[in-house]
Amino acid sequence: MPSIDEVDEIILRELSKNGRATLTELSRKVGLTPAAIKNRVEKLEKLGVIKGYSAIIDHSFLGEFLTALIEIELADPESDELSKLIRPILKLENIKDVYKKTGEFQLTIRATFRDVDSLNEFLKKIRRDYLKNMARRIKVSIILENFKEGGVTLL
């Protein structure tokens, strides 16, 4: 794991709050020149510490009014087949996040959909095309309201 210093940590915390922060804004927070900040940000990107930048959007403007958490209990959580399962799922457009975790359900997927029918179609598709015999159970929860996303308070 790459080592970072206190200044890098401040830059990372500021960028996690606002990925569009300018070099000038960051330089004021840290006390370095914008050129020095630029060098540090580029170094953090090159090292893979900064993995990318994205906007937090209201998916309803894309016609996606429903967000669901899909939890999957794997038949064999230690199977080498897991990476083969996850790679094609990551390419599906509605999927926003995928987590491997401890507990009763080893995979959690956060995805957005137009409606319940499109969610049901998606569940049929992943069961049929991806999960096959790898899933013991699937549990779905619908998000009713989102208060914070990507570190940004939405209230």
Swiss-Prot record:
GO terms for molecular function: sequence-specific DNA binding. Residues 23-42 bind DNA. InterPro entries: ArsR-like_HTH (IPR011991), AsnC-type_HTH_dom (IPR000485), Dimeric_a/b-barrel (IPR011008), Tscrpt_reg_AsnC-like (IPR019888), Tscrpt_reg_AsnC/Lrp_C (IPR019887), Tscrpt_reg_HTH_AsnC-type_CS (IPR019885), WH-like_DNA-bd_sf (IPR036388), WH_DNA-bd_sf (IPR036390). It comes from the Archaea. One of its GO terms (cellular component) is cytosol. The keyword DNA-binding applies. Transmembrane segments: none annotated. One of its GO terms (biological process) is response to amino acid. Keywords: DNA-binding, Transcription, Transcription regulation. Residues 4-65 form the HTH asnC-type domain. Pfam families: AsnC_trans_reg, HTH_24. PANTHER family: LEUCINE-RESPONSIVE REGULATORY PROTEIN, TRANSCRIPTIONAL REGULATOR, ASNC FAMILY. This is Uncharacterized HTH-type transcriptional regulator PF0054. The lineage of its organism: Archaea, Methanobacteriati, Methanobacteriota, Thermococci, Thermococcales.
